[in-house]
Amino acid sequence: MLIIETLPLLRQQIRRLRMEGKRVALVPTMGNLHDGHMKLVDEAKARADVVVVSIFVNPMQFDRPEDLARYPRTLQEDCEKLNKRKVDLVFAPSVKEIYPNGTETHTYVDVPGLSTMLEGASRPGHFRGVSTIVSKLFNLVQPDIACFGEKDFQQLALIRKMVADMGFDIEIVGVPIMRAKDGLALSSRNGYLTAEQRKIAPGLYKVLSSIADKLQAGERDLDEIIAIAGQELNEKGFRSDDIQIRDADTLLEISENSKRAVILVAAWLGDARLIDNKLVELA
């Protein structure tokens, strides 16, 4: 497994792979890898000849400096996991390598609408940072496919739109959420939970599933469903942050023409902001 830290060396390897006619898959990550990331890697390996995993804690997508400062950097452990998975290439650049003149004056990519709604409304600049780094990685790696987790549902929708709008010839693969046995969606942020909070955390998925059951039973008073869910989260020990029920295909409000709904939930548990989602077919 090659570990590359600079743009010239990455370009050199990508040119070689292209000359050899290899099909390349990219898995963009911020490191602190868990089994959910490994599921992305496995999906990429099944679809391509060569798998490139990027590990970069992107300062442009953090709206709170304290979150950036405390985000776990576990490069050695991450590389050991990826080597066991037989990943071909790890791209682990420094911030200086990606943003040589800093982030303030760096050209950015913004996806109107999707960047500022829902999760974007509570995290200003976050999705602009995501679309900027992902587009830069697409230009550098030139992958045939790229794999993203469905846990970040809005992010996946944003990347699909960016790819369509910018004309990237890349297949975007959404990989289903991987959960612990108790239902908690795997996330790097779960590491912020204390042992006691970890016992409470599966309650998020239980509330999510309760909303889904109500929708499948034909309930359509969304304001009441959301209000009850927020109360249930608070009673379980969370601080409810945002609960949305949206059209899964547009992320707009549910209409009589909506065929699928996506339930998007964000809640604080101690210092960890947990997010989760669930798709529901509407009768």
Swiss-Prot record:
GO terms for biological process: pantothenate biosynthetic process. Pathway: Cofactor biosynthesis; (R)-pantothenate biosynthesis; (R)-pantothenate from (R)-pantoate and beta-alanine: step 1/1. The active site is at H37. Signal peptide: none annotated. Homodimer. GO terms for cellular component: cytosol. The keyword Heme does not apply. It comes from Escherichia coli O81 (strain ED1a). (R)-pantoate binds at Q61, Q155. It is found in: Cytoplasm. ATP binds at residues 30-37, 149-152, 186-189. It catalyses: (R)-pantoate + beta-alanine + ATP = (R)-pantothenate + AMP + diphosphate + H(+). The keyword Chloroplast does not apply. Catalyzes the condensation of pantoate with beta-alanine in an ATP-dependent reaction via a pantoyl-adenylate intermediate. The reaction proceeds by a bi uni uni bi ping pong mechanism. Belongs to the pantothenate synthetase family. This is Pantothenate synthetase. GO terms for molecular function: ATP binding; pantoate-beta-alanine ligase activity. Gene3D superfamilies: HUPs (3.40.50.620), Pantoate-beta-alanine ligase, C-terminal domain (3.30.1300.10). It is an enzyme of class 6 (ligase). Beta-alanine binds at Q61. Keywords: ATP-binding, Cytoplasm, Ligase, Nucleotide-binding, Pantothenate biosynthesis. Its EC number is 6.3.2.1. It comes from the Bacteria. InterPro entries: Cyt_trans-like, Pantoate_ligase, Pantoate_ligase_C, Rossmann-like_a/b/a_fold. It holds the Pfam family Pantoate_ligase.
